[in-house]
Amino acid sequence: MERDERPPSGGGGGGGSAGFLEPPAALPPPPRNGFCQDELAELDPGTNGETDSLTLGQGHIPVSVPDDRAEQRTCLICGDRATGLHYGIISCEGCKGFFKRSICNKRVYRCSRDKNCVMSRKQRNRCQYCRLLKCLQMGMNRKAIREDGMPGGRNKSIGPVQISEEEIERIMSGQEFEEEANHWSNHGDSDHSSPGNRASESNQPSPGSTLSSSRSVELNGFMAFRDQYMGMSVPPHYQYIPHLFSYSGHSPLLPPQARSLDPQSYSLIHQLMSAEDLEPLGTPMLIEDGYAVTQAELFALLCRLADELLFRQIAWIKKLPFFCELSIKDYTCLLSSTWQELILLSSLTVYSKQIFGELADVTAKYSPSDEELHRFSDEGMEVIERLIYLYHKFHQLKVSNEEYACMKAINFLNQDIRGLTSASQLEQLNKRYWYICQDFTEYKYTHQPNRFPDLMMCLPEIRYIAGKMVNVPLEQLPLLFKVVLHSCKTSTVKE
């Protein structure tokens, strides 16, 4: 799945609200988590702690840094450093990912100005409408995007395209997407890779049309991913699990027969579980009645929670059963790219009682000012909507600790991340836990044949939300968490 861009220096969220390189003066700087840097250095004595870093608030975790001496090319959309030819034109990773998500999710944006906003590295996130408009005007080819939403274009040789102003207007208004949907619905959906298959999830509950289309794209991607693997010959080291390649034969109307879990599947899941720290979070979250929590205090608490959760992910890496199979460089690269997703996944599952219980009680004692409410960005509103939807999905599924451990490993072993030295080995490890998770869910939840794809479809959503949260200005995070936690806790109590 495509990863979202990191926020540009000084860039803000949507809706024209300004972003910050550091917390504003009203907020205390987050606590440094230098211990995380030391912990990662311990993974390989040869590093001597000499690593570049990516900030978490003001803390650091190691990350590989591209060579500045590489040839500099400019993105035709925003002027940032280009990384290659993407969908027909030279562009950066950020605009590439933005264009792909906009087309795959059939997004329809609005411009609050005159539809001529400046596109630059610092301002590209302020107006999604004008950003997509410039992508189309500069010749980005939406037909080069794979219809299943998976990485890799359909035809890398396709160059920029020239389309009429009328067609651009149809795309920007969403009319083009509606016409395509009607076309495919009238021509059947026998091909998993066709857009018509996306209509199959239209009757699923979702908080809005954007989430519904996103869910259908993810299901289509899941089907293509599954078919790719199921059509392959079974590798020798996977043949010990005979049930793994029978998923395509399952019918929602005819649950599979009960069977036993393969001993080696059980063993690998047990090893994953042994790596997990399921003890309650140690960060104090209890506040006396009647105390009014300030924005600065809530922000500091969120930073301490993020520090503890990040520390647990680093400790988890060192206990993984495949720890010796990958290089330290790859582990550093993987953690730098997925730490937000790992924290979000754990917060929605194994630590959800504390996050949506104790932390929700703290956020309830925080009252945002009128200015904070007025300045809240559209980007933050989208994150809120998707987080609430994802919370209810996890609450409905009641994800077990074993499923959580498998999902976490699958998400972490993302071979599409740039800078990896062992992508093929990562792919094999990813498949291993993909199959084991499928084996476990089919064994334990015999009468829920759709459970495994439902679990897997949560992972792209987590990646998308984690990427979007990076673009939310820091001073808006206390309000964001207050709204999400209040909504989720209130709806759960009503149930």
Swiss-Prot record:
Region (Disordered): 1-34, 145-165, 177-214
PROSITE patterns documented for this protein: NR_LBD (PS51843), NUCLEAR_REC_DBD_1 (PS00031), NUCLEAR_REC_DBD_2 (PS51030)
Residue span of region Sufficient for interaction with UIMC1: 187-268
GO molecular function: DNA-binding transcription activator activity, RNA polymerase II-specific; DNA-binding transcription repressor activity; protein homodimerization activity; RNA polymerase II cis-regulatory region sequence-specific DNA binding; sequence-specific DNA binding; zinc ion binding
InterPro entries: NHR-like_dom_sf (IPR035500), Nucl_hrmn_rcpt_lig-bd (IPR000536), Nuclear_hormone_rcpt_NR3 (IPR050200), Nuclear_hrmn_rcpt (IPR001723), Znf_hrmn_rcpt (IPR001628), Znf_NHR/GATA (IPR013088)
Keywords, comma-separated and alphabetical: Developmental protein, Differentiation, DNA-binding, Metal-binding, Nucleus, Receptor, Spermatogenesis, Transcription, Transcription regulation, Zinc, Zinc-finger
DNA-binding region: 72-147
SMART domains given in the database record: HOLI, ZnF_C4
Keyword Phosphoprotein appears in the UniProt entry: no
Keyword Metal-binding: yes
One Pfam family cited in the UniProt record for this chain: zf-C4
Residue numbers binding Zn(2+) 2: 111, 117, 127, 130
Main location: nucleus
Alphabetized SUPFAM superfamilies for the sequence: Glucocorticoid receptor-like (DNA-binding domain), Nuclear receptor ligand-binding domain
Residues binding Zn(2+) 1, per UniProt: 75, 78, 92, 95
Segments of skewed composition (Low complexity): 202-214
The NR LBD domain, residue ranges: 264-495
GO CC terms of this entry: nucleus; transcription regulator complex
Compartmental location: Nucleus
Biased composition annotated in UniProt, kind: Basic and acidic residues: 180-192
Cited function: Orphan nuclear receptor that binds to a response element containing the sequence 5'-TCAAGGTCA-3'. Acts as a regulator of embryonic stem cell pluripotency by mediating repression of POU5F1/OCT4: binds to the DR0 element within the POU5F1/OCT4 promoter and inhibits POU5F1/OCT4 expression during embryonic stem cell differentiation. Required to restrict POU5F1/OCT4 expression to the germ cell lineage. Involved in the regulation of gene expression in germ cell development during gametogenesis.
Subunit (UniProt): Homodimer. Interacts with UIMC1.
Protein name, as recorded: Nuclear receptor subfamily 6 group A member 1
Originating organism: Mus musculus
